[in-house]
From Swiss-Prot:
Enzyme Commission identifier(s): 6.3.2.6
Organism: Shewanella sp. (strain MR-4)
Family of this protein: Belongs to the SAICAR synthetase family.
Protein name: Phosphoribosylaminoimidazole-succinocarboxamide synthase
EC class: ligase
GO cellular component: cytoplasm
Length: 367
């Protein structure tokens, strides 16, 4: 079995029984189960949700995206070995820690395989919940050009690149393209302020205006739980993105939960603590891959300029990246996952076959 065979690049073609089209994201694919299968699993597996809750199988891939494009490597390598299992393992660890600290639940009900979650359907908040403890990345680039107001928050003068901010900042952006909201352009990933959300809370998916306080509390509390755990590993939690949604509990009450993934190298910046104290930035996140791409291609503006998207897509499609660069990313992801979880990350030789076998034999979901 070759290295390329161990990578799960295509994850939307599994023979899972469903009445709906498979939803394919950049990294995960979602298979919505039939009503009958959802009810059967809730009953037989004892999931703590109402019996009519829609369930889905969420399968992660090893694909790697950056600058809104999917990249590949030499030798037919269509993803990063170990990446999918590492992301899921890290999220699983943080969600468990959140529960131990009395924070909200997540959408995950079951983990049949390192690449697979069984999740409950949620009503998503249409906000990318971003939290920043250090000034770097896009915020630093804007600050260095003279901008001082970010998402309604005014930053002080005299900040330096990569320094710790005086306060933990919440800098939300839109999730998807939202129309008809005053002052908010109908574009994906637009920065918004808390006042934007308060004035249009229902358009952003909040059921009550008071839930804005709850979402901010869950965001900050979750950030602090992860930051403390990473600090114990001499890692710096720089910034991150969370997602939230509503589910209905067994008593018919609506509750806010964490969704998607949390505290991973895909959704966060994580720096090595020793290197940071020495004045250097050693990335333990996807930011290192982004920096590699900017240095690898002769014209980095293609990757940064949204007006050059056709060129960027061609660049990603037509250029196989060096194998060593792909393996560097693999070592970053599996390394930080093993630090966080304290366990080796499983790398199945044929993940797709393993997933099908488990979902057939233990869940009766394969057609």
């Amino acid at each position: 079995m070759s290295l390329a065979d161990s990578v799960l690049a295509v994850n939307n073609d599994l023979p899972i029984r469903t009445d709906n089209p498979v939803h394919s994201g950049k990294v995960r694919s979602v298979y919505w189960l039939t009503d009958a299968d959802s009810r059967r699993l809730i009953q037989t597996k004892g999931y703590n949700v109402p019996e009519d809750t829609p369930l889905a199988i969420m399968v992660i891939s090893d694909r790697i995206s950056a600058f809104d494009c999917i990249f590949h490597g030499e030798g037919g390598l269509k993803g990063i070995p170990g990446k999918g299992a590492a992301l899921n393992a890290i999220s699983n660890h943080w969600f468990k820690l959140f529960a131990e600290n009395g924070l909200a639940d997540s959408h995950i009900l079951d983990i049949p395989h390192p690449f697979v979650w069984i999740v409950q359907k949620a009503r998503p908040i249409k906000v990318e919940a971003i939290c920043r403890q250090y000034i770097t990345g896009s915020m630093w680039r804007a600050y260095s050009k003279g901008e001082r107001v970010f998402c309604g928050i005014t930053l002080p003068e005299g900040l330096e690149k990569d320094q710790k901010l005086p306060d933990l900042l919440i800098t939300p952006s839109t999730k998807g393209i939202l129309t008809g909201i005053p002052g908010v352009p109908a574009q994906d990933d637009v920065n918004i302020s808390r006042s934007d959300i308060e004035a249009n809370y229902q358009a952003f998916g909040f059921e009550k205006v008071e839930d804005i306080d709850l979402y901010e509390k869950l965001l900050k509390d979750g950030f602090k739980v992860i930051a403390k755990a990473l600090a114990d590993l001499d890692q710096v939690f720089v910034d991150t993105k969370f997602e939230f949604g509503y589910v209905t509990d067994k008593n018919g009450n609506s509750k806010l939960i964490y969704m998607d993934e949390v505290g991973t190298p895909d959704s966060s910046r994580i720096w090595d603590g020793a290197a940071y104290r020495d004045g250097k930035i050693l990335e333990n996140s996807k930011e290192g891959f982004r920096q590699f791409l900017l240095n690898h291609f002769p014209d980095p503006d293609i990757l940064l300029n949204k007006d050059r998207m056709p060129e960027r897509e061609a660049l990603a499609r037509d250029n196989a990246l060096p194998l060593e660069a792909m393996m560097d990313v693999s070592r970053t992801y599996t390394g930080i996952a093993e630090k966080v979880t304290g366990a080796a990350i499983p790398l199945p030789a044929n993940p797709k076959a393993d997933i099908i076998k488990i979902l057939r034999e233990e869940y009766d979901l394969i057609v």
